[in-house]
C-alpha cells in the first residue's frame, strides 16, 4: 500500500466541498486543553455506523497520543442539503478538515493498486475497498485498518510531503507485524512527528483565530 501524499491529485475533487458558510470555532486551546482539529467525515462508501465509530476512535487515539484532540462530524452524502447552518456545509480551513470514505479510488496518476488514500489541501480520501482488502490479508477487523488510514492521511494534511517515516503511523507500507504490535504503539507518530503536528495545529489555531477576527472587523 502506498499511502504517499498526492499533492497533485484530483484537485477538482475539492469542488465538492465548496464553502457554504463561515466555520464554527471549535479549535481553540483553552484552559490548557490540547489543540483541536475539526474533521468532517463524508461516508460515500456507506460504512456501517459501528465500524465508522470504531475507526474514528482508533484515529482519535493515535492523534491524541501526539497531543491533538479531534472533533468528528459525520456527514451522510445521501441526506438532503440542510443549508448553511449544517456543519457538513462549513468552510474547510486551517483547523476544519474533511475525510472522504470512498468505495474505491479509481485510476489516479502516480498511484498503484495498493494505494489506500491521498491527501490534498484540507481534504483526505480513503478507499474502503483497499481497507477491506488489507484487513482480509492480515486477519484484522476493517476498523483496525480504517482508523489508522484516516490518522495517516490527516497526518499528511498536517505534515505535508515530509510526512512519511520508516516506522509508526506514517510508514508508507504497513506489515502484518505492525497490526500485531498496534496495541503497543506501532501506529503512533514518532516523537519528532508528534512535535511537528502539535506545532502545525497550534499555528493553524492562531491562523484560524486571526481570520475570524479579521472577518468580524470587516463585517461590523
Language model features: what each stretch is:
Residues 24-31, 40-57, 118-140, 144-145, ...:
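Metalloprotease/metallohydrolase-associated module, dominated by Zn2+-dependent proteases
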Residues 7-10, 157, 216:
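Short amphipathic alpha-helical "recognition" segments used for binding
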Residues 26-27, 33, 37, 70-74:
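Hydrophobic alpha-helical segments, chiefly the membrane-spanning helices
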Residues 1-5:
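N-terminal secretory signal peptides that target proteins for export/translocation
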